[in-house]
Amino acid sequence: MSVSKSVVACVLGLAMTTGGAALAQTGDDPALKNMNACLSGTSPSSEAAFMTNLNPALNDPDRVAWCLFLYVNTNAATSGNNNALFETWASDNDTFQTNPVWPGPGSDVKPLRRPLLPNLKQQEPGGLTPFVLPFSSTQCQPGQLCVGEEVRRNKPTFDFIKDNKLYTRDGLRAYTKAITFPSDSIEVKANWVPASQLAQFLAGSGSPSNPSLYHLNTTVENGQTVQYALVSFHLISKMVPNWTWATFEHMNNPGRCDVIGCNDTFGANPPATAPHGNPGQQYPNCTKSAALSALFAGSKIDPAFTNYCLKGTQTDFTDAQGVQTRLGNSVTEQGFVDTASCITCHGRAAYSFATGGWSPNRVFLYNSTPIGPTGPLDPGQFWLYPQMDPMRPQNAPIFRATDFVWSIPFCAVDAAGNSRCVAK
């Protein structure tokens, strides 16, 4: 059995270390070593455990989610910031420029924007376009959800977009192959609240407004240093063809487990929390399991990250009985958690030149009405006649898929050098 374990560790370690070289970090990167060890898991004591370890992303997704969590949140602070590793990666602002550049160390600007999903508006002649505006703490108004958002991608993801010129519409028109990201790709979508606005964010939930319980970082707005608290984030990786999907929230988020509950079979005790009948309230803290506590103890990470909870993971569009799976968090999918499915929503990420112009695919099913798609993808979203004779080539494509990455159709730079995701 020790030989089998060595094979598992070798396969997983090789896959992740190969990606590690592309991360532009030192060859002896302790964060990557920790993640490789975490993904390999404990030495299997049975054939079932051995087989589970062969494909942990599908067989043990909650553990894999925490392995990724500890990796992307590895302490990367330098003078003047409190960066986790993902905060040093490329943002949409870095990626969707006429000349994308990997960010340098120690930036004091966090490129926050208003959350994308609640701010979609209809585009003529069809489809939806993101209504993206820069976010700052000065925009916070009484009675409004005051949240900023950012998307970050690691070096392999950034390089794939840059090297294939997928950051411009002209580049997408010229790229004739199927878009398939490398297996070491990782993306994070993070939501932040100004620390000074935490009381308003938590109002009515019974949660304490204590910034020390949060991962905090600062940015410069109008020449002033402003502190932000991390409240939630999505985390995806290309370990499997349809990516891994996980969402995390701070333990004190109002309504954290509303509608779909919270489920974490690896890191939480108890592993499942049912939704309250009265929405918007505080839920009990997600007490960490002994296995997860041991992983935290061996990681170089801001201690405040122990206050974050895995809301859930997603590995497929449906369960084994064909029931549509759902996943969404109370901040990013605020207002439509009941119809949120990360894998289905991102599976619709696509663009079209079919009418001669440019159009990203719709996010919501009914234009700007916030009803998300769930379940398997509809081939009619991509092909004009998807049910034609299977022995003949499919008819004209309508939309071209972007391998579950919405930033490409949302943010691709137009002929004038502008991106809808980048403030000028």
Residue ranges of predicted features:
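Bacterial N-terminal signal peptides
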Residues: A9-T18
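Bacterial N-terminal signal peptides that target proteins for export
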Residues: M1-C10
